[in-house]
Amino acid sequence: ITTGEAVAAMIINGLGFSNRPLYLTPQFFENKPMALLFREGVEAQHFNRSKLGRSLEAVYRYGVDQLFSEIAVIGCQQEQIDLRFNSLDTSSFSLTGAYDSETDEQAIKITYGHSKDHRPDLKQAVLELMVSQDGGVPIVSQAWDGNAADTVIFKQRAESLINEFKKIGSPRYLVADSKLYTEENSKIIKELFYITRIPGTLKLEPQLIQQVLDEADWQPLNDGYRYQRIELGHYGIDQRWLVIYS
Protein backbone atom coordinates (compact mmCIF):
# COMPACT_ATOMS: atom_id res chain seq x y z
CA ILE A 1 0.00 0.00 0.00
CA THR A 2 1.05 3.60 -0.56
CA THR A 3 1.74 6.23 2.08
CA GLY A 4 -1.44 7.99 0.99
CA GLU A 5 -3.50 4.85 1.54
CA ALA A 6 -1.94 4.39 4.97
CA VAL A 7 -2.82 7.96 5.95
CA ALA A 8 -6.35 7.53 4.58
CA ALA A 9 -6.71 4.38 6.68
CA MET A 10 -5.65 6.24 9.84
CA ILE A 11 -8.20 8.97 9.11
CA ILE A 12 -10.98 6.43 8.51
CA ASN A 13 -9.99 4.65 11.70
CA GLY A 14 -10.14 7.94 13.58
CA LEU A 15 -13.63 8.61 12.22
CA GLY A 16 -14.81 5.18 13.34
CA PHE A 17 -15.43 6.33 16.94
CA SER A 18 -13.80 3.14 18.20
CA ASN A 19 -10.98 4.75 20.22
CA ARG A 20 -8.64 2.00 19.12
CA PRO A 21 -4.88 2.61 19.07
CA LEU A 22 -3.16 2.64 15.70
CA TYR A 23 -1.57 -0.77 16.12
CA LEU A 24 -5.11 -2.25 16.10
CA THR A 25 -5.89 -0.69 12.71
CA PRO A 26 -5.84 -4.10 10.93
CA GLN A 27 -8.49 -5.31 13.39
CA PHE A 28 -10.62 -2.24 12.67
CA PHE A 29 -10.65 -2.98 8.93
CA GLU A 30 -11.34 -6.73 9.18
CA ASN A 31 -15.06 -6.31 8.43
CA LYS A 32 -14.80 -3.29 6.13
CA PRO A 33 -15.25 -3.28 2.30
CA MET A 34 -11.57 -2.72 1.48
CA ALA A 35 -12.02 -2.73 -2.30
CA LEU A 36 -14.58 0.08 -2.01
CA LEU A 37 -12.57 2.11 0.49
CA PHE A 38 -9.22 1.65 -1.26
CA ARG A 39 -8.79 -0.68 -4.26
CA GLU A 40 -8.77 -4.31 -5.23
CA GLY A 41 -6.03 -6.30 -3.53
CA VAL A 42 -5.74 -4.14 -0.41
CA GLU A 43 -6.20 -6.18 2.76
CA ALA A 44 -6.66 -5.23 6.41
CA GLN A 45 -3.34 -6.80 7.38
CA HIS A 46 -1.48 -4.39 5.08
CA PHE A 47 -2.15 -1.59 7.59
CA ASN A 48 0.21 -2.93 10.24
CA ARG A 49 1.97 -0.65 12.70
CA SER A 50 5.28 -0.82 10.81
CA LYS A 51 3.69 0.54 7.63
CA LEU A 52 1.73 3.17 9.53
CA GLY A 53 4.85 4.24 11.42
CA ARG A 54 6.89 4.61 8.24
CA SER A 55 4.05 6.58 6.66
CA LEU A 56 3.88 8.99 9.59
CA GLU A 57 7.64 9.51 9.33
CA ALA A 58 7.27 10.26 5.60
CA VAL A 59 4.52 12.81 6.29
CA TYR A 60 6.67 14.45 8.96
CA ARG A 61 9.63 14.76 6.60
CA TYR A 62 7.45 16.24 3.87
CA GLY A 63 5.82 18.75 6.23
CA VAL A 64 2.46 18.15 7.88
CA ASP A 65 1.17 21.70 7.44
CA GLN A 66 2.26 21.86 3.80
CA LEU A 67 0.66 18.51 3.01
CA PHE A 68 -2.60 19.50 4.70
CA SER A 69 -2.79 22.71 2.66
CA GLU A 70 -2.02 20.99 -0.64
CA ILE A 71 -4.66 18.31 -0.08
CA ALA A 72 -7.23 20.88 1.05
CA VAL A 73 -6.74 23.01 -2.07
CA ILE A 74 -7.06 19.95 -4.33
CA GLY A 75 -10.27 19.01 -2.54
CA CYS A 76 -11.64 22.53 -2.99
CA GLN A 77 -10.84 22.44 -6.70
CA GLN A 78 -12.59 19.09 -7.12
CA GLU A 79 -15.68 20.35 -5.30
CA GLN A 80 -15.52 23.73 -7.09
CA ILE A 81 -15.15 25.71 -3.87
CA ASP A 82 -14.61 29.42 -4.53
CA LEU A 83 -11.12 30.31 -3.25
CA ARG A 84 -11.07 33.97 -4.23
CA PHE A 85 -11.54 35.14 -0.64
CA ASN A 86 -9.45 33.53 2.12
CA SER A 87 -10.14 34.44 5.76
CA LEU A 88 -7.17 34.27 8.15
CA ASP A 89 -7.42 34.30 11.94
CA THR A 90 -6.01 32.72 15.09
CA SER A 91 -7.48 31.06 18.16
CA SER A 92 -5.90 30.35 21.54
CA PHE A 93 -6.44 27.15 23.49
CA SER A 94 -5.91 27.20 27.25
CA LEU A 95 -4.16 24.19 28.77
CA THR A 96 -3.42 22.84 32.23
CA GLY A 97 -0.75 20.51 33.51
CA ALA A 98 2.99 20.20 32.94
CA TYR A 99 4.63 19.82 29.52
CA ASP A 100 8.12 18.55 28.80
CA SER A 101 9.24 20.66 25.84
CA GLU A 102 12.67 19.02 25.85
CA THR A 103 11.30 15.79 24.37
CA ASP A 104 10.81 17.24 20.88
CA GLU A 105 12.91 19.91 19.18
CA GLN A 106 9.97 20.86 16.95
CA ALA A 107 7.38 21.18 19.73
CA ILE A 108 5.62 24.49 20.15
CA LYS A 109 6.00 26.28 23.49
CA ILE A 110 3.05 25.98 25.86
CA THR A 111 3.30 29.32 27.61
CA TYR A 112 1.43 32.44 28.69
CA GLY A 113 0.15 34.84 26.05
CA HIS A 114 -2.84 36.93 25.00
CA SER A 115 -5.76 34.66 25.88
CA LYS A 116 -8.75 34.72 23.57
CA ASP A 117 -10.37 32.28 26.01
CA HIS A 118 -10.21 35.04 28.66
CA ARG A 119 -8.03 32.81 30.85
CA PRO A 120 -4.75 34.73 31.28
CA ASP A 121 -3.99 32.57 34.32
CA LEU A 122 -3.47 29.50 32.09
CA LYS A 123 -0.75 28.64 29.63
CA GLN A 124 -1.88 28.20 26.05
CA ALA A 125 -1.17 27.26 22.45
CA VAL A 126 -2.17 29.28 19.38
CA LEU A 127 -3.74 27.86 16.23
CA GLU A 128 -3.60 29.72 12.92
CA LEU A 129 -6.37 28.87 10.47
CA MET A 130 -7.19 30.16 7.00
CA VAL A 131 -10.53 29.14 5.51
CA SER A 132 -12.37 29.73 2.26
CA GLN A 133 -15.18 32.25 2.46
CA ASP A 134 -17.20 29.79 0.40
CA GLY A 135 -18.18 27.09 2.87
CA GLY A 136 -15.52 27.86 5.49
CA VAL A 137 -13.23 25.05 4.30
CA PRO A 138 -9.85 25.03 6.15
CA ILE A 139 -6.99 25.41 3.68
CA VAL A 140 -4.17 26.42 6.05
CA SER A 141 -3.58 25.20 9.60
CA GLN A 142 -0.53 25.73 11.79
CA ALA A 143 0.17 25.55 15.53
CA TRP A 144 2.19 28.34 17.17
CA ASP A 145 3.77 29.09 20.54
CA GLY A 146 1.36 30.31 23.17
CA ASN A 147 2.86 33.81 23.10
CA ALA A 148 2.93 34.19 19.30
CA ALA A 149 1.58 37.58 18.16
CA ASP A 150 -1.04 37.87 15.43
CA THR A 151 1.00 40.58 13.69
CA VAL A 152 3.92 38.16 13.26
CA ILE A 153 1.72 35.21 12.27
CA PHE A 154 -0.16 37.27 9.68
CA LYS A 155 3.06 38.68 8.26
CA GLN A 156 4.60 35.25 7.74
CA ARG A 157 1.41 33.86 6.20
CA ALA A 158 1.03 36.84 3.85
CA GLU A 159 4.64 36.44 2.75
CA SER A 160 4.10 32.75 2.00
CA LEU A 161 0.95 33.48 -0.01
CA ILE A 162 2.47 35.97 -2.46
CA ASN A 163 3.79 33.41 -4.93
CA GLU A 164 0.78 31.11 -4.45
CA PHE A 165 -1.68 33.88 -5.28
CA LYS A 166 0.35 35.05 -8.27
CA LYS A 167 0.27 31.57 -9.83
CA ILE A 168 -3.50 31.89 -10.25
CA GLY A 169 -4.83 33.95 -13.12
CA SER A 170 -7.82 35.43 -11.28
CA PRO A 171 -7.36 37.66 -8.20
CA ARG A 172 -7.34 36.09 -4.74
CA TYR A 173 -7.86 38.10 -1.59
CA LEU A 174 -6.47 37.69 1.92
CA VAL A 175 -9.06 38.68 4.54
CA ALA A 176 -7.87 39.33 8.11
CA ASP A 177 -8.48 41.59 11.09
CA SER A 178 -6.61 44.79 11.91
CA LYS A 179 -3.48 42.95 13.11
CA LEU A 180 -2.63 42.44 9.44
CA TYR A 181 -2.36 46.18 8.82
CA THR A 182 0.88 47.51 10.30
CA GLU A 183 3.67 49.58 8.82
CA GLU A 184 6.02 46.60 9.04
CA ASN A 185 3.52 44.26 7.38
CA SER A 186 2.77 46.78 4.63
CA LYS A 187 6.06 45.83 2.97
CA ILE A 188 4.54 42.38 2.41
CA ILE A 189 0.83 42.97 1.86
CA LYS A 190 1.48 45.53 -0.88
CA GLU A 191 2.17 42.48 -3.07
CA LEU A 192 -1.31 41.06 -2.37
CA PHE A 193 -4.96 41.88 -2.73
CA TYR A 194 -6.28 42.11 0.83
CA ILE A 195 -9.29 43.16 2.89
CA THR A 196 -8.80 44.22 6.49
CA ARG A 197 -9.99 46.58 9.19
CA ILE A 198 -7.91 49.69 9.77
CA PRO A 199 -6.68 49.67 13.40
CA GLY A 200 -8.05 52.35 15.68
CA THR A 201 -4.50 53.10 16.85
CA LEU A 202 -3.80 54.94 13.58
CA LYS A 203 -4.32 58.69 13.97
CA LEU A 204 -5.70 58.85 10.44
CA GLU A 205 -8.60 56.55 11.27
CA PRO A 206 -10.66 58.88 13.54
CA GLN A 207 -9.77 61.84 11.32
CA LEU A 208 -11.29 60.19 8.26
CA ILE A 209 -14.34 59.04 10.20
CA GLN A 210 -14.99 62.62 11.29
CA GLN A 211 -14.41 63.81 7.72
CA VAL A 212 -17.05 61.51 6.24
CA LEU A 213 -19.48 62.33 9.05
CA ASP A 214 -19.12 66.01 8.18
CA GLU A 215 -19.55 65.35 4.45
CA ALA A 216 -22.49 62.97 4.98
CA ASP A 217 -22.20 61.72 1.40
CA TRP A 218 -23.41 58.21 2.21
CA GLN A 219 -24.19 55.45 -0.27
CA PRO A 220 -26.87 52.87 0.64
CA LEU A 221 -25.67 49.35 1.36
CA ASN A 222 -28.38 47.12 2.85
CA ASP A 223 -30.47 46.60 6.00
CA GLY A 224 -29.92 50.11 7.28
CA TYR A 225 -26.19 50.21 6.52
CA ARG A 226 -24.53 53.00 4.58
CA TYR A 227 -20.96 53.55 3.45
CA GLN A 228 -18.60 56.16 2.10
CA ARG A 229 -15.54 55.32 0.01
CA ILE A 230 -12.18 57.06 0.31
CA GLU A 231 -9.35 56.62 -2.19
CA LEU A 232 -5.94 57.34 -0.67
CA GLY A 233 -2.32 56.31 -0.44
CA HIS A 234 -1.04 55.00 2.88
CA TYR A 235 2.17 53.16 3.78
CA GLY A 236 3.08 53.62 0.13
CA ILE A 237 0.07 51.60 -1.07
CA ASP A 238 -2.83 52.93 -3.16
CA GLN A 239 -5.93 51.82 -1.27
CA ARG A 240 -9.68 52.08 -1.02
CA TRP A 241 -11.03 52.58 2.49
CA LEU A 242 -14.70 52.25 3.41
CA VAL A 243 -16.40 53.88 6.38
CA ILE A 244 -19.51 51.88 7.30
CA TYR A 245 -22.42 53.50 9.14
CA SER A 246 -25.23 51.57 10.81
Residues covered by each model-derived region:
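Anion-binding and metal-coordination hotspots
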Residues: 1-246
